[in-house]
């Protein structure tokens, strides 16, 4: 369903997009909404690959989605918006994504305030 939605939004012209679709919230957007800025979704490798990633992979490879938005939460201890394995290794290298990646509102601020993975706000 996501692939068809993306194709409808972006159109079929190879020279330009009608609109830029954005697949979100990459990749393990789970857990209580009230603690989404500090939640750590702990998932097995198998669950990640079989449950959470297939829809995003289809959006990237079949739908040619132009943008991907990272989730607020952490996945296995690492904030999704700064997750090397998810954003670089899987999304870019394995799937060949060439579009742009965006963070959700305040997700970068959450590295320090919500997740506590930095010592200072600047870091």
Where do the model's predicted regions map?
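Glycoside hydrolase catalytic-domain context in secreted enzymes
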Residues: 1-123
């Amino acid at each position: 369903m996501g692939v068809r939605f993306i194709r409808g939004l972006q159109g079929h012209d190879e020279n330009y997009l009608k609109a830029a679709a954005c697949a979100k919230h990459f990749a393990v957007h789970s857990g209580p909404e009230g603690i989404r800025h500090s939640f750590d979704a702990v998932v097995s490798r198998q669950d990640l690959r079989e449950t959470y990633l297939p829809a995003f992979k289809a959006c990237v490879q079949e739908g040619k989605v132009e943008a991907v938005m990272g989730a607020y939460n952490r996945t296995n201890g690492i904030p999704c918006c700064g997750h090397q394995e998810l954003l670089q290794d899987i999304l870019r290298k394995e799937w060949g994504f060439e579009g742009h990646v965006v963070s959700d509102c305040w997700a970068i601020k959450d590295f320090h305030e919500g997740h506590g993975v930095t010592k200072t706000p600047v870091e």
